[in-house]
Amino acid sequence: MWKFIVILSCKLTNKLSKLTGHAGSVIGGRVARKLDKNILKKIKLPKYVIGITGSSGKSSSTELMYNILTKNNYKVVYNKEGSNTIDGIASLVLNNSRLTGKLKSDVLLMELDEKFMKYVFEYITPTHLMITNITRDQPP
């Protein structure tokens, strides 16, 4: 029952955020993780979970992978808004899950910020990981 409430809270928070003119792609995940920090461990994920990370090229690579997968008849859930932090991934997963906790897709495709990747991996283990590049893109 608690999982149901947490998932519903995420969905409603994101809808309310969008209604008030915000993107609504992160806040629901933040609320859900405050209610249950392990909620992502309780979601039934699809057979394929793909993470894409790197210093640059994440969004383009994710979009390209999405197009390839959908053209091959896979139902894909991915963070097209680019919300690639732990709360953004939580929103993505929970917003696309049934209230029973099953993700509604064949593939979960996640664009991951390289700094937040380790936090996501505490809760979601990808079956595949693509690293676009490793370069210093910020001053030390």
Please provide the spans of the model-predicted regions.
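Phosphate-binding loop of NTP-binding sites
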Residues: 4-140
